Amino acid sequence: MFNNNSNNGNSNGNRGYNNNNRNNERSQGYNQNIEQQLASQEKKTAYRRTVDHGNNMGRWYINRSLGIDDQPIGKIRPESSYLIDLLPSPAYASNSVRENKNNMSIMDIQTKFVHLSSNKAKHSINTVKWTPEGRRLLVASHSGEFTVWNGMTFNFETIMQAHDSAILSLKYSHNDEWLLSGDQSGVIKYWQTNFNNVNIINGHSDGIRDIAFSPNDSKFLTCSDDSTMKIWNFNNGQEERSLVGHHWDVKSADWHPNLGLIVSGSKDNLIKLWDPRASSCVSTLHGFKHTITKTKFQPTGTKRLLASVSRDKSCRIFDLRTMKDILVIRDHETDLSCVEWHPVHPSMITTAAYDGSMNHYIMDSYISDNNIKNDSNNNSTSPIEASHKIPYAHEKAIHALEYHPLGHLLCSAGADRSARFWSRARPNDPMSFQDALYTNDKVGAWYYGVNNNINAVIEPSTASVNKDDPSSAQAINLPGLNNLPNGNESTTNGWGNIPGLRGH
């Protein structure tokens, strides 16, 4: 009996082993069939719009190695074949010839719309930041999400839930190793470069509008809608000082890149300069008649200028030596929302407004190299014309402007729930200024959207149809159904145009 049972067990085990082999053979055959079908399918080439700065950067390095960098840089001829002569932004900034700097208005302003990026679940975008190496763009939305886009091909890379409430501010440290974010509920978070969250601070009782690092990254500054600013120790996350002096929401703050000086702009229409060591206000700048929305120190050049914009439709440039405004720009039709200095050209700024417009200004013709006005007879409110205007850059208010670290790209984002990329236009490109961003003609307009697909933006037809008048129905054209009868055709001899009954 024992032997019989063992034989039965062996036979059952052999059957199970054979069944497993058959199943494995079937699955392998199935996988091979799928691979053959996929291999037999014709693969379509995917075209992707790319902004590649490697060519002109390499050409510039070759010129520098040959000693050509110190020679005058002429204007590019208005032909597409001369695109090879377009150099990177640092080339025009480093050239010592004064008249070449003025050529910047033609060769080095971000006027060409390149790409539109938006998430599937769309939310208003409050702030954006390029990663320190410039390869990616970090977008922070009202939903508390981080979205990362490729900085050259503009395709989607990743998304993560970073905060529980709307993210209002982002700031990278000067050593490029840390990222700070602040949200609507007053929470501050520390992030490593791989977006690993290592620390959380309950910093304010209201939304954190702006964050700035000290020059040595040992401290950072936050401003909030609770009308206060705070200086924090970065290493232990402890509050060191509280700067109290504004009587309303503090909308913007910045720490000078070299000096021990802090600037803040508030809803009380005042700009205040602070000593971070004494927690005291050293000066108050007047002149604005409405909320100050953004204040930024000059990051390059002499670093003696301060740019600020307000909801009174003006932008003011202050000289830190005299504590007075040396330029007042009133070129927008609506309130201004943000301002950004160019990272390479010290005299170039970009402003954005709540109506979605964006202007570029080059102040070389108004301010000389030593930041003293060229014409002392003109007052500071003399009219200044924009070097370039983009009247319909966004459909709604622009909340953020951010230049690429190399200066050849600009990203703008706002309440229309999209981030848009701008580059320098090609020489004599007829399509650079003929799209909907300049003409506002959105009927049949297109944008390069997510993954470089063309997203049609079609406005509803304004033609009215009278239901009581049958003849008005001929104005309605259904796609793919052209030249169909609409029921109003003439019926001569009682037959009309019925197929097969001609000549009656």
From Swiss-Prot:
Which cysteines link up through disulfide bonds? none
Q: Transmembrane residues, as ranges?
A: none
GO terms under cellular component = chromatin; mRNA cleavage and polyadenylation specificity factor complex
- List the subcellular locations: Nucleus
One Pfam entry name: WD40
Q: Which GO terms describe its biological process?
A: chromosome segregation; co-transcriptional mRNA 3'-end processing, cleavage and polyadenylation pathway
The entry's protein name is Polyadenylation factor subunit 2
